């Protein structure tokens, strides 16, 4: 499964380095799109918790086509 996480603000290189399983690119509204493969929905929840611990505000989560 592939998921995309839209983060409200730009993500620093330091924060992105803490999430090596995700790629990132600027989002048109000024935030950041982070995306990558996950094993299952528990993995999605773990990523969300890690993002929260890094101070990232996730505003949208969506499953991408495989």
Spans of model-derived segments:
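Long, contiguous binding/interaction regions
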Residues: 1-66
């Amino acid at each position: 499964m592939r998921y995309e996480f839209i983060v409200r603000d730009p993500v620093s290189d330091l924060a992105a380095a803490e999430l090596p399983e995700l790629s990132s690119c600027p989002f048109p509204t000024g935030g950041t799109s982070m995306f990558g493969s996950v094993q299952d929905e528990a993995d999605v929840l773990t990523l969300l918790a890690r993002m929260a611990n890094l101070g990232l505000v996730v505003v949208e989560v969506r499953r991408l086509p495989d």
